[in-house]
A protein has these predicted regions:
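Short amphipathic alpha-helix used as the core "switch/output" element in two-component signaling
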Residues: 71-82
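Acidic catalytic/metal-coordinating carboxylates
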Residues: 42-43, 69-72
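The feature encodes the CheY-like receiver
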Residues: 66, 94
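C-terminal output helix
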Residues: 96, 114-124
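Two-component/phosphorelay signaling modules centered on CheY-like receiver
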Residues: 21-39
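Acidic, metal-coordinating helix/loop segments flanking the phosphotransfer/catalytic sites
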Residues: 40-58
């Protein structure tokens, strides 16, 4: 069975929020190879300062950010009426955090480092 094709006529925009610059660069590279457009933010606060979340097909949020957590970011966006699907990712996993992420509302929860195909599949499900 072949791999799914993710390319669309107009690139799907994925917003990525992570405070690790190297990780952001890797994710942008992966997604661009598969036809996605990306917008990146190094903090939840930076994303909240604008209206970028309104233009995205999905949000890829790190849970453990320097200020507002990815989970709190999702809650704030949902509270302001955003219905943009969320994929949470974290390098520090525990059962409480996983449950909190699920309760906040997400289409996927990925443990870093994750297989690139898992991310692509999660985005296909979300977008």
């Amino acid at each position: 069975m072949g791999r799914a094709t993710y390319m669309a006529a107009k690139p799907t925009v994925v917003i990525v929020v992570d405070d690790n610059a190297g990780f952001l660069k890797s994710v942008v590279r992966l997604l661009s190879v598969h036809g996605f457009a990306t917008r990146t933010f190094s903090s939840a606060e930076a994303l909240l300062d604008g209206d970028a979340a309104q233009t995205a097909a999905c949000l890829l949020l790190d849970i453990h950010l320097g200020g507002i957590s990815g989970i709190e970011l999702q809650r704030r966006l949902a509270g302001s009426g955003s219905t943009c699907p969320v994929i949470f990712m974290t390098a520090i996993e525990d059962d409480f955090t996983r449950q909190e992420a699920i309760n906040a509302g997400c289409v996927a929860y990925l443990k870093k480092p994750f297989d690139p195909q898992m991310l692509l599949d999660a985005i296909a499900k979300a977008a």
